[in-house]
Structure formats: structure tokens, C-alpha cells
């Protein structure tokens, strides 16, 4: 998992990462009681603003639209019907962007909303337009805030009875963030969730340890993946898939706990916080 001494130059390697994709999971944005974690939200926005002021480019992939829609509607349980899920997404997405706009405006940063479906990656013309738009936004010093367009997408909202092996370009924001990184030619993927990283089993079980570094995503590593949470769609398996996409493209990925204050600063300093995934080849 972690060859001796391999982490010694991690800080030096990460210092050279100038374009980052940061993915915020629903359980980072939302509290356990289903309300918005505003303090944590604004803290992460401040960290991103510092990265921008230090000359780094940031693309932010943000979950949370459905969770925010559920909050607005007073729902405690995730809806089972597709139309209800999409209604939650429509309500929550505007709320999500309003919070981002308020936070980043106070910090002197400009943002843009980018909503994607799998067709944006399948269709060559739409894909070319997407790449051009992201490049233009970054060139203007704008932070693209990217989310799957849940209101119109029909293949990625998991519902009871869904076939487990449906062919998808992406089915969650974890994998989407990996695809965004490769197509935007970014250097580092930061997956922020409510867990400390990849564990060698159930984190609550005795003797289970946090894995600080992974140099190859083997079947053993995949076996450590846990299930999904209640509000979001992603789990450890989808994060490993995102890490696989990124590392096979020659980039770094890290899974870290977005509840930890200043975790982004620690990640960008190359600290061994969370679980780091090393590139399989040179970028």
C-alpha cells in the first residue's frame, strides 16, 4: 500500500499542483439533523478563496441540491419517486448556489454554475463546448461550481429497484469529479466527505486502521469500500472509482474529512491527512 519513504516528497509534489478539483459531499454541506452546516460551509469557502489568492485554480464539484431541497420541503427521508427527487433537486440547486454566491462574494471571488448530464461527455460537440467553457471561466478567474443536473438527468438518481449494473458515464458526483479533473487537465482531486479516509474495514470495528497512502487500487483495496449514506448517493466505492480515474491519468487524489477545520490547507501543504492515492504514471 505504501512503499517505504514514498511519502517523503509528497509535499513537494503537491506544491506543484496548480489546478485543483474539490468535491464536496452532501454530508459536508448538511448537518446530521438535515439542516445546512453553514459554519463548515463558510470555512471551506474561505479555504478555497485562500487557494485562489495563492494563485491556484479551483473547480468545485458540489453535491447537496437534493439534500437542500429536502430541507426546504421538510422531508426527513429521501424520496423514492424520480419526479420527487428531481423536484427536490430543482428546489435545492437554487438554494445551493445562493449560499455559494453569498459566501464567495464576501471573499472577493466570482463563481459560475455548471450543470452537467452524461450527454455532455458522450456527445463530442457538447464535450468540446464544455472544455472550452471551463477553460474560459478559469481564465477569467472564476470558480466553476459543478453539479450533476439532477432535474433533467434520468440515469443517475438511485431509486429502489434500479438495476445494479446499468451502464453510466457517471452516476454520482464522485465519479463526475474524476472526469472533470481529467478533462480540465487539473493536477489534484480532493474528495471531502464526513469520513477520515479509507479504512481497512468497518471504521467502528476493533483493529481497523486508516490507510494513509494507496499506490495501487487492488481488489483488496476495493474490498474495504463501505456502503452509502442516507442523504447522498456516493459511498467509498464511488470515491475509489474517482481515484482510479485520476491516478490512471497520472494525477493525485485524496479522500479527507471535510468536517476538519482547515483540512484543505493541510491537503495542499501535502500533509498525510486522509488517504492519498498516488499516480500510476507520470502526468
Predicted feature residues:
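C-terminal catalytic "cap/lid" subdomain
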Residues: 2-78, 82-110, 114-283
Amino acid at each position: 500500500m505504501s512503499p517505504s519513504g514514498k511519502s517523503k516528497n509528497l509535499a513537494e509534489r503537491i506544491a506543484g499542483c496548480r489546478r485543483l478539483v474539490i468535491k464536496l459531499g452532501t454530508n459536508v454541506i448538511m448537518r446530521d439533523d438535515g439542516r445546512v452546516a453553514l459554519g463548515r460551509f463558510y470555512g471551506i469557502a474561505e479555504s478555497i478563496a485562500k487557494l485562489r489568492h495563492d494563485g491556484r485554480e479551483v473547480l468545485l464539484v458540489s453535491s447537496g441540491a437534493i439534500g437542500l431541497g429536502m430541507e426546504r420541503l421538510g422531508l426527513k427521508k429521501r424520496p423514492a419517486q424520480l419526479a420527487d427527487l428531481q423536484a427536490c433537486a430543482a428546489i435545492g440547486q437554487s438554494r445551493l448556489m445562493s449560499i455559494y454566491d453569498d459566501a464567495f462574494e464576501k471573499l472577493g471571488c466570482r463563481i459560475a454554475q455548471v450543470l452537467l448530464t452524461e450527454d455532455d461527455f458522450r456527445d463530442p460537440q457538447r464535450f468540446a463546448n464544455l472544455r472550452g467553457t471551463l477553460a474560459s471561466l478559469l481564465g477569467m478567474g472564476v470558480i466553476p461550481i459543478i453539479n450533476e443536473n439532477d432535474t433533467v438527468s434520468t440515469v443517475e438518481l438511485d431509486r429502489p429497484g434500479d438495476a445494479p449494473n446499468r451502464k453510466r458515464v457517471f452516476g454520482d458526483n464522485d465519479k463526475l469529479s474524476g472526469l472533470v479533473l481529467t478533462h480540465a487537465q487539473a493536477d489534484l482531486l480532493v474528495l471531502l466527505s464526513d469520513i477520515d479516509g479509507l479504512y481497512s474495514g468497518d471504521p467502528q470495528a476493533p483493529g481497523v486502521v486508516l490507510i494513509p497512502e494507496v499506490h495501487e487500487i487492488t481488489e483488496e483495496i476495493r474490498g474495504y469500500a463501505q456502503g452509502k449514506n442516507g442523504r447522498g448517493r456516493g459511498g467509498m466505492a464511488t470515491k475509489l472509482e474517482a481515484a482510479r480515474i485520476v491516478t490512471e491519468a497520472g494525477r493525485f487524489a485524496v479522500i479527507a474529512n471535510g468536517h476538519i477545520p482547515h483540512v484543505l490547507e493541510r491537503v495542499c501543504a501535502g500533509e498525510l491527512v486522509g488517504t492519498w492515492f498516488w499516480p500510476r504514471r507520470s502526468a
